[in-house]
Amino acid sequence: VNTKPVRVAFQGEPGAFSEAAAVGLLGEAIETVPRPTFDRTFAAIGDGAADLLMVPIENSLAGSVLRVFDLLLDHNLAIRAETVLPIAHDLIGCPGATLAGIRSVESHPMALAQCERLIAAHPEWKRIPAEDTAGSVREVLARGDRSCAAIAGTRAAKHYGGVVLASNVQDNARNF
């Protein structure tokens, strides 16, 4: 009996929304394989690092993820399953941080745009674009600066030991 966990590659860092989608669809027993780009995620199948991929093909607000469709064709891969993941953004800071003490917020540009109301309510906040939502949490926590916060999902806060300063800060709850 093969007891090795299924290895699932995803684009992003541990705590990313795609990792949450993989675990939600396939269960906690999988081994997640983070990759920095979609190209590297798809390459994980060919180089034997992963058995499956979890990649977004569409976002209800941003539309189709065209690069993923191109890579599906380039690698001759087929979609085997689908899941819908609600995208809920949290404002995440270091332990000891307070909402009143925040002076900068970082995240992927799409996440920053999806949380415009929160950010606009705090004109003193500097916006800092990042490559990845979960990666922005990792960076904020690594710096330990209580005046910095990141926008990402709850999974990233738990993974990196961040504190959720505000929950569900996205402008549109119908983001999947």
Regions found by a protein language model. Name each.
Residues 1-176:
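Domain-level signature for soluble enzymes in the chorismate/prephenate branch of the shikimate pathway
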